[in-house]
C-alpha cells in the first residue's frame, strides 16, 4: 500500500468496537477493519458467540478481544463500554451493527415484539453512541458508523418495528452528526441492501420472492458480508474526515431504480 493510501485508509493504532460481530455483516466488518490495521473489539450476545470471529481475526494476526453484551440492556451496555475503555484505553471507531427483526402483519404485531425490536435496534444503538461518544469527546476525535437499512427509506411489509427502528437510526445518525461534527467526531451510517445473511435466509428459501427481489437489483445479485468492508473502512478512516451525517447505500443499485 502506498504512503498516501496508508495515511488515508490505514487504521493502525485505532481501537474499533463492532457490535453484532458474531456472524454475517458484523463479522465481515470486523475482519475488514482488522485487516486495515485496527485493534478489533468484537461484541456479541455473549463472549462465546464471537469466538469464531476472534479465531478468524487471530489467524490474520489482528489484535482483538471479544465481549458479551445484551444490546437491549442499558446498564449492560454502559458497563461494557466502560470495561472496553478500562482495558484498551480508548475507542476510536464504533460500528453499531447489532440488530433484530420480527415479522408479523401490523394489526397482529405484539407489544412484546415491538418493544424488543425498538430496544435493540434503536435504544441500544443510542446508548452505545452516547457512551462511546463521551469517550470520543474526551479524546477529541472519533468515528461512529450506524448500520441502517433500505427500510430507513421505505416502509417494507410486515416489519413495522424494524422499519421504524431503522428510520430512527438514520435520523439519530444525522442528529449526532450535527451535535458532534465540530468536535472532530464523524457520525455516519451504512444502509445495506439485500445481503445473504441469516436474517434473509427465509426470504431466500422462497424461490418466487427471491427471484423477484434479485430481478430488481441492478447488479443482479445479492450482497455478501465482505461487500461492506470497503464502506466501513472508508467511514472509519481519515479519508472520510469531511463526511458527516451521511447514510451510505451499499445496495447493488436498489435505491437507484
Protein language model features and the residues they cover:
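Alpha-helical segment proximal to the catalytic Tyr-Lys
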Residues: 134, 178-182, 241
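Substrate-binding pocket helix/loop in short-chain dehydrogenase/reductase
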Residues: 105-106, 113-118, 213
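Active-site helix of classical SDR
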Residues: 129, 165, 173
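Residue(s) in the substrate-gating loop at a strand-loop-helix junction
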Residues: 149
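Conserved glycine-rich cofactor-binding loop
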Residues: 15, 22-24
Amino acid at each position: 500500500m502506498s504512503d498516501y493510501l496508508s495515511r488515508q485508509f490505514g487504521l493502525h493504532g485505532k481501537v474499533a468496537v463492532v457490535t453484532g460481530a458474531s456472524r454475517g455483516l458484523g463479522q465481515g466488518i470486523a475482519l475488514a477493519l482488522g485487516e486495515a490495521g485496527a485493534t478489533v473489539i468484537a461484541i456479541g450476545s455473549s463472549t462465546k458467540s464471537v469466538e469464531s470471529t476472534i479465531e478468524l481475526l487471530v489467524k490474520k494476526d489482528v489484535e482483538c478481544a471479544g465481549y458479551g453484551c445484551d444490546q437491549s440492556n442499558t446498564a449492560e451496555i454502559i458497563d461494557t463500554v466502560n470495561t472496553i475503555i478500562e482495558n484498551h484505553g480508548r475507542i476510536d471507531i464504533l460500528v453499531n451493527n447489532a440488530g433484530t427483526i420480527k415479522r408479523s402483519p401490523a394489526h397482529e404485531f405484539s407489544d412484546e415484539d415491538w418493544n424488543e425490536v425498538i430496544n435493540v435496534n434503536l435504544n441500544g444503538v443510542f446508548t452505545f453512541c452516547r457512551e462511546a461518544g463521551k469517550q470520543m469527546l474526551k479524546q477529541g476525535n472519533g468515528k461512529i458508523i450506524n448500520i441502517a437499512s433500505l427500510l430507513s427509506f421505505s416502509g417494507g411489509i410486515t416489519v413495522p418495528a424494524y422499519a421504524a427502528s431503522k428510520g430512527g437510526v438514520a435520523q439519530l445518525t444525522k442528529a449526532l452528526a450535527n451535535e458532534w461534527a465540530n468536535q472532530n467526531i464523524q457520525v455516519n451510517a451504512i444502509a445495506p441492501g439485500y445481503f445473504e445473511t441469516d436474517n434473509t435466509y427465509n426470504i431466500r428459501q422462497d424461490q418466487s420472492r427471491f427471484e423477484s427481489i434479485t430481478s430488481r437489483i441492478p447488479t443482479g445479485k445479492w450482497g455478501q458480508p465482505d461487500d461492506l468492508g470497503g464502506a466501513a473502512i472508508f467511514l472509519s478512516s481519515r479519508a472520510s474526515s469531511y463526511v458527516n451525517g451521511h447514510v451510505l447505500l451499499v445496495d447493488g443499485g436498489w435505491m437507484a431504480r
